[in-house]
């Protein structure tokens, strides 16, 4: 899809590079004509140069994470942000709040809910701003498992199609608390098997006979409190969080502990799931599940900086469902 035009002056387009052909083959890219192919190749090569220069900083010990080419390689940062993000202005409503508790004695230094069976495999939202739906199902899947012992993949597509009266706007964004409100009022959410994901807006096809889980409400973590978020992740389970992911460094993250100095604690545009925490190389991190398939990041996950002044706003808007 051609969504913009680059003005190229004095740029000689060389013969197609092997890396470009490899990228197209790996990700099944087919463009409408040679002009768009050339346009996308310029973007790809610019992104490739950015990755190479960033990784030199990693090799020199200047940064704590590295980057790699992925399926977003032919997209500008503006296109990436427009297509892959999915948060809209929040509605304010009364809700219970989880405040950090004063604790004494040693505390768990690491938590990983994947090892306890509370996390479904990494999913793929496709080119649809439905990250909020995946964060919603992820936290509810975890809470349902912890209550019943059964891990069931829940239907993001139902949230995309059916929850608009409660605030979410399908592929144009939404918020997890509004989705929790919908699930509560609807008396449940179907299994993913019964209501498969399509990565597009559709008509509501909810089937009450396929309900797998429900919730009775939700609780917010005290805004901005990484201590509160840590306690919630440790004691409650996987937690829905929202972050500032509007950076090329996030677009091409590969491994290591992600710290972005230009991140905002209040400009939040992407919903993900905090499934644990730990430390690596002296750097505290949050273990975060994304919804961009396993080809992105560290098999679909990212380690985000913890205890560094709420970097990227990971503790600004965090919540979990009550089951």
Swiss-Prot record:
GO BP annotations, alphabetical order: proteolysis
UniProt name for this protein: Digestive cysteine proteinase 2
The keyword Secreted is annotated on this UniProt entry: no
Stated family: Belongs to the peptidase C1 family.
Disulfide linkage: 128-171, 162-204, 263-312
Domain of life: Eukaryota
Main EC class the enzyme belongs to: hydrolase
PROSITE patterns: THIOL_PROTEASE_ASN (PS00640), THIOL_PROTEASE_CYS (PS00139), THIOL_PROTEASE_HIS (PS00639)
Active site: 131, 270, 290
Classification of source organism: Eukaryota, Metazoa, Ecdysozoa, Arthropoda, Crustacea
SUPFAM superfamilies, sorted: Cysteine proteinases
Gene that this polypeptide is encoded by: LCP2
Protein keywords: Disulfide bond, Hydrolase, Protease, Signal, Thiol protease, Zymogen
EC number from the UniProt entry: 3.4.22.-
Propeptide section residues: 17-107
Signal sequence interval, chain numbering: 1-16
Single GO MF descriptor: cysteine-type peptidase activity
């Amino acid at each position: 899809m051609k969504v913009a035009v680059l003005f190229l002056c004095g740029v000689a387009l060389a013969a197609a590079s092997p890396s470009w052909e490899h990228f197209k083959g790996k990700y099944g890219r087919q463009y409408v004509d040679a002009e768009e192919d050339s346009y996308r190749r310029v973007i790809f090569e610019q992104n490739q140069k950015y990755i190479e220069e960033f990784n030199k900083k990693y090799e020199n010990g200047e940064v704590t994470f590295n980057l790699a080419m992925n399926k977003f390689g032919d997209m500008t940062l503006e296109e990436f942000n427009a297509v892959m993000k999915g948060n809209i202005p929040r509605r304010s409503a009364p809700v219970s709040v989880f405040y950090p508790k004063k604790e004494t004695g040693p505390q768990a230094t690491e938590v990983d809910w994947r090892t306890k069976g509370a996390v479904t495999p990494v999913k793929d939202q496709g080119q649809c701003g439905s990250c909020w739906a995946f964060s919603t199902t992820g936290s509810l899947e975890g809470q349902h498992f912890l209550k019943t012992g059964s891990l069931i993949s829940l239907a993001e597509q139902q949230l995309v199609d059916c929850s608009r009266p409660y605030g979410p706007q399908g592929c144009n964004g939404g918020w997890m608390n509004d989705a929790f409100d919908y699930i509560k009022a609807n008396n449940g959410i179907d299994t993913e098997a019964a209501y498969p994901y399509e990565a597009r807006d559709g008509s509501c096809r909810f089937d009450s006979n396929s309900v797998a889980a429900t919730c009775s409400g939700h609780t917010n973590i005290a805004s901005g409190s990484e201590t509160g978020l840590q306690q919630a992740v440790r004691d409650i389970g996987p937690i829905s969080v929202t972050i500032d992911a509007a950076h090329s460094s996030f677009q091409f993250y590969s491994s290591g502990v992600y710290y972005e100095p230009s991140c905002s604690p209040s400009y939040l545009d992407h919903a993900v799931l905090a499934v644990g925490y730990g430390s690596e190389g002296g750097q505290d991190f949050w273990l975060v599940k994304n919804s961009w398939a396993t080809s992105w990041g560290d098999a679909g996950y990212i380690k985000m900086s913890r205890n560094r002044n709420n970097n990227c706003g990971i503790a600004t808007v965090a919540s979990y469902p009550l089951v």
